[in-house]
């Protein structure tokens, strides 16, 4: 999936940075598009000491801490809107936390996203916690 993100310009598109909080970090952006006809939402999570929007704009690679992905997969997990979840390090390797690879039917992701309005596990409908999404076609 990470290789597909790179091939389809998710990684290189101009991003709309905005301020946020846990678990995705104080500065982030969201890119949305399709990979193999599957809706894909990518959140770039930036962090570090005294981070600002300006610092990330100037040197995004320095501040990038994680890339989190939601991908809609037909009949994958109907109980949770068929979303597949993954959390990558900037180098493309998957995060491992508490001896668990952060991908698939990730309970941490699902638990948080169940609080989103709109019944689709995305925060696109929550104007107070969302910013402009960059769309890649």
Residue ranges of each PLM-predicted region?
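The canonical Cys-X-X-Cys-His
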Residues: 106-117
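Extracytoplasmic c-type cytochrome modules immediately beyond a signal peptide or single-pass transmembrane anchor
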Residues: 1-106, 122-137
């Amino acid at each position: 999936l990470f290789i597909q993100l790179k091939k389809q310009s998710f990684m290189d598109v101009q991003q709309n940075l905005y301020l946020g909080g846990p678990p995705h970090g104080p500065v982030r952006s969201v890119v949305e598009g399709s990979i193999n006809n599957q809706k894909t939402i990518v959140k770039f999570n930036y962090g570090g000491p005294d981070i600002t929007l300006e610092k990330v704009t100037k040197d995004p690679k320095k501040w990038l801490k994680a890339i989190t992905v939601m991908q809609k997969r037909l009949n994958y997990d109907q109980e949770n809107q068929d979303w597949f979840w993954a959390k990558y390090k900037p180098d493309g390797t998957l995060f491992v936390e508490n001896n668990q690879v952060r991908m698939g039917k990730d309970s941490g992701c699902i638990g948080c996203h169940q609080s989103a309005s709109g019944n689709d596990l995305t925060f696109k409908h929550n104007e107070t916690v969302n910013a402009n999404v960059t769309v890649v076609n």
